[in-house]
Amino acid sequence: MSYSVLPELYRETAVRLADALDGGGYFSGSVRFAFGGMECRLTASVIVCRRRESLPEGDVDAVADLVPVWWEFHTADGEGEVANDFSFSEMKAYL
């Protein structure tokens, strides 16, 4: 059985990863969370490319792209790990 990753899960993963980036140019770590009865974990090492954006509140360094060096996305239910069809490039569209 394979768990189909829905747009809502990609969005949730992107939000949690963006929060974990913490303004740096490189991220290596994991984000874990529950979603729809599944325990999810993204473990990744990524290079963070940023661009300067001028906003009325001031300038910010927004994420322009993430270049994955290595990543794994795990989903598990009460019976153990469940294979999934996660795509890092699809998740990036939600950043």
Task: Put a short name on every predicted segment.
Residues 2-26, 30, 54-95:
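Acidic, low-complexity intrinsically disordered segments
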